[in-house]
Amino acid sequence: MSNLGKVIQIIGPIIDIKFDSENLPDLFNALEINAGDRKVIAEVEQHIGDDTIRAIAMEDTEGLKRGMEALDTGKSVSVPVGKEVLGRLFNVLGKPIDGAGEFISEESYPIHRPAPSFEEQSVEPEIFETGIKVIDLLAPYEKGGKIGLFGGAGVGKTVLIQELINNIAKEHGGLSVFTGVGERTREGNDLYYEMKESGVLEKTALVFGQMNEPPGARMRVALTGLTMSEYFRDQGQDVLLFIDNIFRFTQAGSEVSALLGRIPSAVGYQPTLATEMGALQERITSTKNGSITSVQAVYVPADDLTDPAPATTFAHLDATTVLSRSITELGIYPAVDPLESSSRMLDPRIIGEEHYEVAIKVKNILERYRELQDIIAILGIDELSEEDKLVVGRARKIQRFLSQPFTVAEQFTGMQGKYVPIKETVRGFKEILEGKHDNIPESAFLFQGTIEDVLKKAQQMEI
């Protein structure tokens, strides 16, 4: 028998509904409110008194009024999962919003699910090879790890994300789920068409809950994307989950918390900030079947890293990739800052002695070059000692060798994209550090894949 209630109060996206006291819906149950020509989905957040629940709408509440009927579905919001979701674009409720025709999925999962138990989780730290030299060498990703992607507007976050999607699809046969949380609709639209053009769309599912949507949708859309990823992981796949932007997840939670009347905590954030973040992040993990590796774009409000939202996110991250405007000004792409980016995988016990030594030496030489730049700016390079001149020469070659042509940017750059295995990356940088290529001009190192490509370019330049 269906369990019906009546809407008794609506304040923006918050809806109070009266049920029989013995048939009160459970927390997180989805409710369908019949608004005549459409059904509005809301999620139960609080029980008020004996017979009333407070729900948050997942869709626009326009047209709702008191006295309307609400049906308790008896389960939480469920979204479609399976290979059918690839190449399609969904909203928080798992409804397609790409206008690409009817969508039929055989299976659906609830968005609220427990995290894998300790027994199910994989404990062996394993490197996730991206084929992008600067990441693999200096701040490697962990399979099933969480990576923070930091960078302002226009420094190449989207292109880096697309290249990662392309590389996992083509080199590892893996899949990707892109979750747009509270960002601009225009950016989502651009991403969709760019993915279509670069040919990575059929290996990706996209889930959007953008800036103009109610806070309930923005708060839950990350769980929708995560649920789709979990299905693929449980089928033995390696999945790449992108969350853009994790700050908006916290921001939406803060709005909902205030609307529900909870007393705010530090800087006006919700008192449950750490719990909500933990519930999301704990589900992103490797199991013995497969892995979910997540790359999360992190907006830092007013560049304050001590703000509770980014500070809570940091506690969960295994690696950080920092994109820097000063590197884009040098014309080096991807504009990953080799000194600011970090990873807990940079450990000789995980990556091996050789890789570790090369990475540390590369960081040291770039650090020394940064120190010498002031002297060069004032006195000129001729005033440096012979040893320092050698350091500067090698550092500039390393800096350029950290650049790389991307497959997804081929149509703009005219350069064929390169995927570089970790072994080749380590070998190339080791040879530069050993001085084997001191006689090769700097320009030969720019936008090349392996060290062999550099040697070929140098030969062409001589002709």
UniProtKB/Swiss-Prot annotation:
One of its GO terms (molecular function) is ATP binding. Its EC number is 7.1.2.2. It is an enzyme of class 7 (translocase). ATP binds at residues 151-158. It holds the Pfam family ATP-synt_ab_N. Keywords: ATP synthesis, ATP-binding, Cell membrane, CF(1), Hydrogen ion transport, Ion transport, Membrane, Nucleotide-binding, Translocase, Transport. It catalyses: ATP + H2O + 4 H(+)(in) = ADP + phosphate + 5 H(+)(out). SMART domains: AAA. It is found in: Cell membrane. InterPro entries: AAA+_ATPase, ATP-synt_VA_C, ATP_synth_F1_bsu, ATPase_a/bsu_AS, ATPase_alpha/beta_chains, ATPase_F1/V1/A1_a/bsu_N, ATPase_F1/V1/A1_a/bsu_N_sf, ATPase_F1/V1/A1_a/bsu_nucl-bd. It is a peripheral membrane protein. CDD domains: ATP-synt_F1_beta_C (cd18110), ATP-synt_F1_beta_N (cd18115), F1-ATPase_beta_CD (cd01133). One of its GO terms (cellular component) is plasma membrane. NCBIfam families: atpD. Belongs to the ATPase alpha/beta chains family. Produces ATP from ADP in the presence of a proton gradient across the membrane. The catalytic sites are hosted primarily by the beta subunits. F-type ATPases have 2 components, CF(1) - the catalytic core - and CF(0) - the membrane proton channel. CF(1) has five subunits: alpha(3), beta(3), gamma(1), delta(1), epsilon(1). CF(0) has three main subunits: a(1), b(2) and c(9-12). The alpha and beta chains form an alternating ring which encloses part of the gamma chain. CF(1) is attached to CF(0) by a central stalk formed by the gamma and epsilon chains, while a peripheral stalk is formed by the delta and b chains. This is ATP synthase subunit beta. The gene is atpD.
